[in-house]
Amino acid sequence: MKRILLLVVVLVSIASIASAWSPRHDEAAVILATKHLTPRALAFVKDCLGDSYDDDVAYLYKLEKGHQSPYSKSVHKLHLNTDLTPKNVDGDDALKGLEQALEVVREHEKYSSFEVIAALRAVINLMCDIHNFANVCIDGVPHSQGDFKFQIVGGRKGPSTAKWSTFFSSYINFHKGFSATYWAEDFEIYYGSEGMKLANGTLRDWVAQIGAKAAELYATNHPDREMPLRERLEYEPLAYEMVASTGYRLAALLNEAVK
């Protein structure tokens, strides 16, 4: 019975899919992760998802985008208490689904190949959902409970309206000539040997860090706010840090799960 319930949760978890992924934002994180998988973890991933591994393309992301199963367009939310600990909620929650999917990956010999593939895909998708601040719902922070629009002022073309859910992805997407592979390599060079330190601690430690940074942004950003362009540019390093930390954390999770 436990196995049936777990499979149901995993299948629900993989509902957030292509439209929820930024073309380069999440892809760059996954490409970065593939660069830091152990030989055993990489072999496991290739065995689960196919034989067409291409060093120049994010393998996991490529398989994810090319999958033909009908998925919903929903995005999974991360629910946190005021102290940034995980909130126990009924129904869908990104962290809950991620932890349960990881359990299947760790115990993959006990499950069918279908169950393991579903779990692996869920891990990838849910990690990308969690690091987007627009998906972080924090008790006591009302503006974190849903998407909203705000205005950026001070640009050459006058005020522009943006959605909070695309706030971080807009930094990478702004540089249209740079591929996701370029961004992953850029993060690799920038962080160097220090990169995996972004994955220090437990998964829940990482989630709390995401929550803390999200709370800081929500404290000053709200619906219909006029954000000066200079301030928006000040957030750019934070956006890149979130992408990089997601890639390194994803690699650490898979390396730990597949020993």
Task: Report each predicted region and the residues it spans.
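N-terminal, motif-rich segments that launch catalysis or mediate targeting to/interaction with membranes
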Residues: 19-126, 133-259
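Sec-dependent N-terminal signal peptides
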Residues: 4-14
